Amino acid sequence: MKFSNITIKNFRNFEKVNINLDNKNVIFGMNDIGKTNFLYALRFLLDKEIRKFGFNKSDYHKHDTSKKIEIILTLDLSNYEKDEDTKKLISVVKGARTSANADVFYIALESKYDDKELYGNIILKWGSELDNLIDIPGRGNINALDNVFKVIYINPLVDLDKLFAQNKKYIFEESQGNESDEGILNNIKSLTDQVNQQIGEMTIIKGFQQEITSEYRSLKKEEVSIELKSEMAIKGFFSDIIPYIKKDGDSNYYPTSGDGRRKMLSYSIYNYLAKKKYEDKIVIYLIEEPEISLHRSMQIALSKQLFEQSTYKYFFLSTHSPELLYEMDNTRLIRVHSTEKVVCSSHMYNVEEAYGSVKKKLNKALSSALFAERVLLIEGPSEKILFEKVLDEVEPEYELNGGFLLEVGGTYFNHYVCTLNDLGITHIIKTDNDLKSKKGKKGVYELLGLNRCLNLLGRENLDEITIDIPEDIKGKKKKERLNERKKEIFKQYKNEVGEFLGERIYLSEIDLENDLYSAIGESMKRIFENEDPVHYLQKSKLFNMVELVNNLSTKDCFDVFEHEKFACLKELVGSDRG
């Protein structure tokens, strides 16, 4: 079984959205944009504990009760032969699934507001043909849907004590009838009786019992006596059991008092229940902002659990935490955002096999960018150090205003651009006009920088070129020859360069260092105490860039920002300067 799509109409802040889904989904966006409402749309559809309350007027988009609330979930059942969950669902839906369209199945909710009852009653339907759905059979608040699905909603402020108390009976009823425990239970009962007997013999207890009995009889003429007993003897010893944490190698017990520790223990209990109590159902986790109260390291640990453990086969996670996305793979990213009305953009995120060894590195960089409005993609750490310095001086609140610098680690542009584009996040690219010599082909070069930009536009690579440089020309002189050729190539393909600018792709005429020299050449000479600062900078790019950045004046930073070769920075901050 695979979640395929959801359509939400006239529900809370959603006028109409149509969103592609998968079995693992991450929902993100600004505060108060609709992430919780998205989860509640699923809860109304699949969770009887929420559904039984029906809809209030405020649940209708802009309180427009003249239109129905509609929520339609599309499932892909094409893996029937291999998937046990698909078989579970099919065994319950029976005749609602027709052979004509057996691989697709719809679960739909609609609610028309009753002005007299001041209430929106819920009608559930399902079937394989969207235009011919049938009512889901049920009785009262329970229907056939509830026999196959179990929604586990985890509140950001999950209450451990309440969760444990609610499920204590189920957890410990499992041990009843276990012969190996019968002797132990009898011993506990005997010991409990002894405890109560000893309690009753205490002078302070006897005195209190006598006085309170006397007070009671003075109020009500009744032949009774008041005695104090341990709750364990009356309710059973399970009633007094609460979880403690015991560190390995330590004989002491520690209360689960920290919020982070309590939350992780709550997740452990939910997982236990999913495996034991709901093993015959399809369990769907709806997890809301779990990062609250969790230290960064615990968020990373939870990320590993969510994306790698089979327990979390189906989940919808809302979050503001990049750390929770470090381990993501085969995950549907859903961005809830707003222009004039709330819209949802989605992207199926996969780490290609070729990138498997650097998955965490790729995810770590991308996960922070997902929460931005505009992202400037740059090649490496030197660019990042420089641009951070310039922006800190010129536009220090660029991140607060939605900007983000994303270091792609060389040439992984495509991996990020596709994701950002699908999610409606503005992306800007700054890259060098690189040439790459072909192995085994003397004097033959690939137009690497131009091809990189063309590939981002879905275009084919340009043909290789030949650059004839005599063998006696090496080192700095050879580089100068190559740079002259880069300038010629830049002019030759000026039309393509113009197209790139229209797509927010900024290709350097040569490279970052030469762009920088065009903007603040004299300052570079002064700081490096060198008449060829570009060559000096490139000898040890990162190390020397740090030296440069540490000595840039505020004027230098403004000169870089205002220079045409760094127009990408204005694009990032949305500046209309100049």
UniProtKB/Swiss-Prot annotation:
A divalent metal cation 1 binds at residues 379, 463-464. Residues 1-341 are annotated as: ATPase domain. Optimum temperature is 37-42 degrees Celsius. Disruption phenotype: When this gene is missing the Gabija type I system does not confer resistance to SpBeta in B.subtilis. Residues 370-510 are annotated as: Toprim domain. The keyword DNA repair does not apply. A divalent metal cation 2 binds at residues 383, 513. ATP binds at residues 32-36. CDD domains: TOPRIM_OLD (cd01026). It comes from the Bacteria. Optimum pH is 9.0. Gene3D superfamilies: P-loop containing nucleotide triphosphate hydrolases (3.40.50.300). Keywords: Antiviral defense, Endonuclease, Host-virus interaction, Hydrolase, Magnesium, Metal-binding, Nuclease. Rapid, sequence-specific cleavage at physiological concentrations of Mg(2+) (4-5 mM) or Mn(2+) (15 uM). In presence of >20 uM Mn(2+) has rapid non-specific cleavage activity. Endonuclease activity inhibited by all NTPs, dNTPs, NDPs (at 0.5 mM, UDP not tested) and AMP-PNP; not inhibited by any tested NMP, dNMP or nucleoside. Inhibited by 100 mM NaCl, 100 mM KCl, 0.5 mM Co(2+) and 0.5 mM Ni(2+). Changing residue 35 to A: Retains endonuclease activity. The N-terminal ATPase-like domain seems to have lost ATPase activity, but may still bind nucleotides. The C-terminal Toprim (topoisomerase/primase) domain probably has the endonuclease activity, but when expressed alone (residues 348-578) has not activity, showing it requires the N-terminal ATPase-like domain for function. Homotetramer. Forms the core of the anti-phage defense complex. Interacts with GajB; 2 GajB dimers dock at opposite sides of the GajA complex to form a 4:4 GajA-GajB assembly (GajAB). GajAB interacts with Bacillus phage Phi3T Gad1 protein; this interaction forms a 4:4:8 GajAB-Gad1 complex and leads to GajAB inhibition. This is Endonuclease GajA. The gene is gajA.
